[in-house]
């Protein structure tokens, strides 16, 4: 059974707290980088910021699933020391559930391993910029992991492209659900290509690719990374 990603919104009135269930994907974005290759030890650390559009599935007022777009912001810092990866999840404006945090942490580690990158000098901050909202699930994790790799390598994610899925232990894109709704949400936001797991979730209905949009099934991290950046993972 594939895992889903979602969020809930906190309220000061418990009886009025709405609950949204989301299956998130990530599509990429805006990448701002300031490389400092070969910088001496007294120079500032290398810093990048990436805002990732997130596609998901929520319930409308009639409790029917619909696609939705949110964002996650990644701040990446490459330090001069090698004291270990520091991964921090901000709690304001929104926050990440423990399960989402673990999924993201695992995906980053597996993406770095596949790319043969040492991450012991990195500090990464993740922000969910929606007041009072908590993100749940794991289907954003592959996009976050590969986005961090792209930031470390100084490679851009092509605007209008996105990925939904997890990263499995053997380095493949893991199955997630809600693909038909995610495709429609991506189309509504004028994304031109999304990458989905090659293995389909059994609960998903049949769907058709919208006009002028490309949906690409991928099964390996290298194929997913190439689809997002136009570069090889290693």
Predicted segments — roles?
Residues 1-14:
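N-terminal secretory signal peptides that target proteins for export/translocation
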Residues 38-234:
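Peripheral, non-AAA+ core regions of ATP-driven protein-machinery
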Residues 21-31:
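Bacterial N-terminal signal peptides
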Residues 33-35:
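N-terminal signal peptide c-region/cleavage motif recognized by signal peptidases
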Residues 4, 27-29, 184, 208:
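Generic intrinsically disordered, low-complexity segments enriched for polar/acidic and small residues
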């Amino acid at each position: 059974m594939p895992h889903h990603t979602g969020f809930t919104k906190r309220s000061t009135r418990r009886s009025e707290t709405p609950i949204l269930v989301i299956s998130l994907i990530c599509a990429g974005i805006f990448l701002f980088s300031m490389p400092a290759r070969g910088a001496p030890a007294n120079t500032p650390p290398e810093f990048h910021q990436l805002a990732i559009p997130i596609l998901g599935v929520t319930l409308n007022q009639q409790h029917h699933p619909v696609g939705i777009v949110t964002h996650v912001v990644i701040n990446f810092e490459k330090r001069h020391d090698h004291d270990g990866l520091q991964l921090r999840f901000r709690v304001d404006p929104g926050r990440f559930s423990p399960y989402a945090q673990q999924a993201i942490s695992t995906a980053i580690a597996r993406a770095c391993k596949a790319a043969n990158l040492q991450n012991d000098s990195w500090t990464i901050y993740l922000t969910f910029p929606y007041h009072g909202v908590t993100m749940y699930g794991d289907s954003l994790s592959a996009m976050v992991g590969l986005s961090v790799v792209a930031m470390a390598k100084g490679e851009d994610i092509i605007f209008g492209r996105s990925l939904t899925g997890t990263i499995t232990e053997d380095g493949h894109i893991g199955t997630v659900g809600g693909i038909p709704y995610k495709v429609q949400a991506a189309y509504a936001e004028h994304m031109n290509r999304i990458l989905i797991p090659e293995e389909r979730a059994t609960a998903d209905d049949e769907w058709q690719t919208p006009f002028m949009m490309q949906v690409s099934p991928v099964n390996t991290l290298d194929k997913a990374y190439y689809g997002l950046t136009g570069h090889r993972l290693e």
